[in-house]
Amino acid sequence: MAPYRPEFSAAEQSRIDAEFSRLARNKSVYLDHAGTTLYAENQVTAAAEQLQRNVICNPHTCRLTGDFVDQVRFKILEFFNTTAEDYHVIFTANATAALSLVAENFDFGSTGDFHFCQENHTSVLGMRERVRANGIYMLKEKEISGGELKKNGTVHKVSGKTGNSLLTFSAQCNFSGYKIPLDTIEKIQIDGLSKPGKQLWGSLGENKENTHNDYYICLDAASFVATSPLDLKKYRPDYVCLSFYKIFGYPTGVGALLVSRRGADVFQKRRFFGGGTINYAYPHAMDYQLRETFHQRYEDGTLPFLAIVGLLEGFRTLERLVPKTDEFSTMERISRHVFGLAKYLEDQLRQLQHPNGEPLVELYNKVGYQDKSRQGGIVAFNVRTESGSFVGFGEIACVAALHGILLRTGCFCNIGACQYYLNLDEDAMDTIYKRAGRICGDYFDLVDGQPTGAVRVSFGYMTTFQDVEQLLQMLRSSYLATKPLQRIQFIEEQAEQLPPLLKERVQLLRPKLLQMAIYPVKSCAAFKIELEGSWPLTDQGLRYDREWMIVDMNGMALTQKRCTELCLIRPVIKVDQLELQFGDNSHFSVPLSLEDQAADSAKCVSKVCRQPVEGLDCGDGVAQWLSENLGLEGLRLLRQSGQRNSSKDQQKLSLVNQAQFLLLNKSSVRSLQFEEPLDETVDRFRANIIIDTGSAFEELTYKALSIGGIQFQVEGPCQRCDMICINQRTGERSPETLTTISRLQKGRMRFGIYITRIPQDTKELEAKEHMTCGDVVLVE
């Protein structure tokens, strides 16, 4: 690993630090420059002084204001190494408004299509709603940048073509910092697209050929130009969209759309026009004439002239604090600086490991950090626990905030990049956004243990090496040297210091009761309670859990060791009946009421774990139904009628083998990494109480816990046998379940923990005779 080499001299760094002294005063580390960079202190002071010196008013009134605006247009063109001969500058509110302007005014002709890259800002997805294209297509990044550029090609408009197609992509992905090679622009302008992409709208089944259309490029440069030079002499997109606060930090509310001469030829003013865009418009007739000057036709209404004038100090500040050298321009030096920091951080993150050798972070990038022309100053990642489970990005945001570190979490208004880097298929997207209810900007960070977003840190010219070190130290101290419960306690104790949205996230840090599983008939399938459902408790455990069992002709309890088909009997608890189902059409019901059952039943005795159990025979009808479906003669269904106590501590038990409840941590199940669906693996362990702590095997350290205020003591781990090798949905055996647990537990067959409800001496908790899915789990 190469050592970090600073781009700026000590004197330059000192001048920069002096301009951002407020960070030190506030004990803040700012690492969200892809969201917005920071303004220098003298920058805003100089901008204010300029307003105080001059009378800057509406440009329609004051020529001085118009001169200032023209200066800024010239400076923008110079900044991108081009001139007014090649590009027009249209001021907009931001990059989003620039993209909207392109969508509204681009002339697709009769056959033109709209194409966009999957890894794009949400605003590009919004363009789909406004374009008047023949078809709309999504392209993966490789489909855009994967081809070879023809040599000596010429961009031109070929006669006979009937439409204009538009491709929009980001010069730099704001999620990962990946940069699409800019020579892709000319390639597509010359050759078109080899593949149109996935069709989202339009006439299906059409054979799209490049010969029908000319191709134009709209470059979303907002993330790219904040820290990288864009040379419009070398690369000539037809449209460039940007926001100036990304570059300067101040002012906000002003962006630009740069339109090439080629792009202007297919730009047509649509429907609306505002003040300043026309030569005249009659109120008494549908007659108007637009301005001759191109940019004036599209700058509806009064420009944000004070903000535009403030841009001059932004340019001056960059040139003052990061002066060009004989070798590199200002923006090239900034690019080198942020890339160097990102490369150092990525190198350090790769070295962070848990004591068992598992990596602390999972990084999201395409080409690594070897070439700044392909990767910018952004690092995206998620944190993993020692067992490999993901830590929710909302928790990372809380911990970072309490350490004074400002970073970004989520999908960063780039759901397509989230989909790509997190490997989310269409069903997973529906699970996250439609079924689980996540919305953009929330802290709903894990669904079934899988992340719905990531952590992003991004750098600007004022970011220091020490800032990166503080982030690394926070990760080391919080996630390598601290146990999860200690970390949660730390966050909860400091929660009042957090902003409102993160305070809400603190409430989600504690694990919750996800599901309860009642097994009315011993060794048969579960009846499940989930989605905020409640279930009553008795002094033996969950009501109706293991109250029935099937015995053979010798009176011995039948288990899945002898008959795996037992798992195919599905009990359903109804208002007054227990319905047993086998397959789609076969079912039989017995009374839920013990009194009703006792009236028509004979008493009998069986054994569970060598202990005698008093029971009631449920009759010949259900006995015959069981024998027919399971293919065994002489089966009977018994219901427990007498009290059964544990031989160990006299706790009251149903027909369970060892304890009142078996608790399972879904994170532990997830660590097995079986190919079958996670819920199928959970079913193998036949637990009553399912939680998800985010940290595998954490439950093995518990001594006591409470669920929704109900106290439990831990009896110990559940020692597993080959019963867990049976798939509870098919009855098929697969031995890898047991061997995997043995490997993870170093030869021990422990999975899940037995817990027992702690008796209460008073009746003050009578209201707590139910547990509800969603109850908070507190560990002692």
From Swiss-Prot:
The active site is at C413. It catalyses: Mo-molybdopterin + L-cysteine + AH2 = thio-Mo-molybdopterin + L-alanine + A + H2O. The modification N6-(pyridoxal phosphate)lysine is found at K246. It is an enzyme of class 2 (transferase). Pfam families: Aminotran_5, MOSC, MOSC_N. Its EC number is 2.8.1.9. Its cofactor is pyridoxal 5'-phosphate. One of its GO terms (molecular function) is pyridoxal phosphate binding. One of its GO terms (biological process) is Mo-molybdopterin cofactor biosynthetic process. Sulfurates the molybdenum cofactor. Sulfation of molybdenum is essential for xanthine dehydrogenase (XDH) and aldehyde oxidase (ADO) enzymes in which molybdenum cofactor is liganded by 1 oxygen and 1 sulfur atom in active form. Belongs to the class-V pyridoxal-phosphate-dependent aminotransferase family. MOCOS subfamily. This is Molybdenum cofactor sulfurase. It comes from Drosophila yakuba.
